[in-house]
Structures are given as structure tokens and as C-alpha cells.
């Protein structure tokens, strides 16, 4: 028997799948842990494949269940992560403000997204480790903003360590996705239900493959 549409569940109004994408070491797992559990650690080992966490938030009187997938950033895992673009409603592109190569690789990640993700997927650019001393900064905030503007994305600098803008990033992309889904509901309800059935199914199958390891 097919699973009910995501919005038919009693404990939430919307189920939103998010991906954290970016090079290894930029702090994706730290951002995920800070947002989902309110904690921070530097003792991660490298993520093997994909792991995810869930947090339910409230926006405009609606309960939004966020299913947030943490992807490995290494090149050799990119074939694994491409399968998880399917069904993703939002993608957080993360770089390390002290590592210029991780910033330059954002364009490669965007190309990867354009090849494998839905055309309507929401994207947001995140410059992490903004708590680091300015002498260690390799990517000026203005450069991050310029790249975000080029691709029509919102932009935040964050720190998982100090909790700078972590809540704001996830709430911002969730709000934009909720609005997009609500607009779709208003135009064609059957189409929206179909999208959510697919997303729910994707989340179920992927959950069985998640790794117990975490990192970056």
C-alpha cells in the first residue's frame, strides 16, 4: 500500500528534504549537529556516504518537518551524493571562509546540482567558520555575496561553533520552500500531492542506507 502524502500526516504540515553540499572539512556536519541537536563538537570523523537528522520547526502557524541530509564532500563520493539530489527541495551550499579552494569549488557543486537536482530546487550559499580570526579569512564576505547574487541565491555567513546565523539559514530556506509549495498548492493540488508522495518515498528508502558515521 502506498504511503500517504507527506501533508496528510498529523504531526506536520510539510515534509521538506534538505541537502548540505560542499567540500570535505567545511563544517557541514557541525552545522547539522548545531541546528538539530544544539551542540558542537570538533571530534567528527569524515562522513562516509550520507547521514541525516530531523528537526520539526514552526513557520507561519505551520509545522515543518525538516529532513536534513549530510553528504560527504570528497570527490570519490560524488557519485553517491548525486542519487540523493532526487527529491531534495532545498540545498545548502557550504564553503569554509578560511579555505579559498572550497569557495572556488562551489561552482562545481552548482553544476552538479544543475545536472541532477530538480529545476525548482531552492539553493542558499553558506560561508561557514565565520568565527575564525580575520587574519585566517581567505574569502571576503563581499566575494561570497557576489557569487550568491550571480546565481540568485541568498547568502549567509555562519559559525557552527558560536551558533552565528545557523538558525537563520535553515529557517530562511525552509520559509522559501514552504512558500513555493503553498503557491504550487494554490495552482494545482494534485500535482503537489504527487511531489510529496515521491519525496516521502525517497526519504524512506534513503533512511535505510544512512551511515552511522559523521564528519565535516
From Swiss-Prot:
SUPFAM superfamilies: P-loop containing nucleoside triphosphate hydrolases
GO biological process: one example: protein transport
Motif (Effector region): 44-52
Disulfide bonds: none
Transmembrane intervals: none
Coiled-coil annotated residue ranges, if any: none
Amino-acid positions noted as binding GTP in the UniProt annotation, renumbered to this chain: 22-29, 70-74, 128-131, 159-160
One term under GO cellular component: Golgi membrane
Induction: By ethylene.
Protein location: Golgi apparatus membrane; Cell membrane
Family stated for the protein in its record: Belongs to the small GTPase superfamily. Rab family.
Role summary: Involved in membrane trafficking from the Golgi to the plasma membrane.
Protein name as it appears in the record: Ras-related protein RABE1a
Organism this protein belongs to: Arabidopsis thaliana (Mouse-ear cress)
Lineage: Eukaryota, Viridiplantae, Streptophyta, Embryophyta, Tracheophyta
Amino acid at each position: 500500500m502506498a504511503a500517504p502524502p507527506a501533508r496528510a500526516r498529523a504531526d506536520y504540515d510539510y515534509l521538506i528534504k534538505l541537502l548540505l553540499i560542499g567540500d570535505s572539512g567545511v563544517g557541514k556536519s557541525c552545522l547539522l549537529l548545531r541546528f538539530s541537536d544544539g551542540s558542537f563538537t570538533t571530534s567528527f570523523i569524515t562522513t562516509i556516504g550520507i547521514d541525516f537528522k530531523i528537526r520539526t520547526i514552526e513557520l507561519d502557524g505551520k509545522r515543518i518537518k525538516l529532513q536534513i541530509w549530510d553528504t560527504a564532500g570528497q570527490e570519490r563520493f560524488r557519485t553517491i551524493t548525486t542519487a540523493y539530489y532526487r527529491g531534495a527541495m532545498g540545498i545548502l551550499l557550504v564553503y569554509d571562509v578560511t579555505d579559498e579552494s572550497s569557495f572556488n569549488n562551489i561552482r562545481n557543486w552548482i553544476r552538479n546540482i544543475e545536472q541532477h537536482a530538480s529545476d525548482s530546487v531552492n539553493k542558499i550559499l553558506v560561508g561557514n567558520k565565520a568565527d575564525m580570526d580575520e587574519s585566517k579569512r581567505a574569502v571576503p564576505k563581499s566575494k561570497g555575496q557576489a557569487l550568491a547574487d550571480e546565481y540568485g541565491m541568498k547568502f549567509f555567513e555562519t559559525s557552527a561553533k558560536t551558533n552565528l546565523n545557523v538558525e537563520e539559514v535553515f529557517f530562511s530556506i525552509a520559509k522559501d520552500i514552504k512558500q513555493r509549495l503553498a503557491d504550487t498548492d494554490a495552482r494545482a493540488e494534485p500535482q503537489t500531492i504527487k511531489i510529496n508522495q515521491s519525496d516521502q518515498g525517497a526519504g524512506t528508502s534513503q533512511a535505510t542506507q544512512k551511515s552511522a558515521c559523521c564528519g565535516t
